[in-house]
UniProtKB/Swiss-Prot annotation:
Annotated protein name in UniProt: tRNA (guanine-N(1)-)-methyltransferase
Catalyses which reaction(s): guanosine(37) in tRNA + S-adenosyl-L-methionine = N(1)-methylguanosine(37) in tRNA + S-adenosyl-L-homocysteine + H(+)
Residues that, per the record, bind S-adenosyl-L-methionine: 114, 134-139
Region (Disordered) location: 220-244
A Pfam family of this chain: tRNA_m1G_MT
Gene Ontology MF, one: tRNA (guanine(37)-N1)-methyltransferase activity
UniProt subcellular location: Cytoplasm
UniProt superkingdom: Bacteria
Family that this chain belongs to: Belongs to the RNA methyltransferase TrmD family.
Species this protein is from: Rhizobium johnstonii (strain DSM 114642 / LMG 32736 / 3841)
Transmembrane region(s): none
One cellular-component annotation, GO: cytosol
EC number of this enzyme: 2.1.1.228
Amino acid sequence: MMAFRASVLTLYPEMFPGHLGFSLAGKAMERGQWSLDTVQIRDFATDRHRTVDDTPAGGGAGMVLKADVLARAIDSASETDTRPRLLMSPRGRPLTQERVRELAAGDGVIIVCGRFEGVDQRVIEARGLEEVSIGDYVLSGGEPAALTVLDAIVRILPGVMGNDLSGLHESFEGGLLEHPHYTRPQEWEGREIPAILTSGNHGAIEKWRHQEAVRLTRERRPDLLEKAGASPGKSGSNFGKHDA
């Protein structure tokens, strides 16, 4: 199987691989399970000042990343490439675990890191960029968001986690937030590990974990239950049922 290949187009290539050079992702990169290359967008400017932005048409605050410059950068990285092209943008579709799994199942990804006020809409349309958001907030640039997307993808690539079962009960897998975790000591500051977790009854433990996952999801992310067709206010939905 070919290694997952990530290409990032950015004005700040020195920000990569960042934290992805450490821990699971870093070790996976050393083993050749995935690779990362960066493209300096400014290298594709044609004037002597290496200009990559200009004022917004129609007026307004900030600067806009130029279509011609960015298009040349994209073409250099992916002219005959079928990898998905993502543009990190606060107005994009929210990244979901489902989309992460889809991306991880492919050969790789091309990520464009926006800067300034935005990117010329024409290059978004002409180069088929998929606008992706990691949350309802604005960052100073797309680089931290790109690192977040790659982190989410790389950790679920086959063989990256020591135990491929590790991700099965994580938040958003199965449409629920993850259940609470505990470890030794048994008692800490007067707080005990729930007795069910040390009972040795694995069926009861799984049932408890599922019920806790449903409870936390109902409290913190009722939208996830609504998306799956469950009623956030009722415990009698299918999400609340679990065979021991």
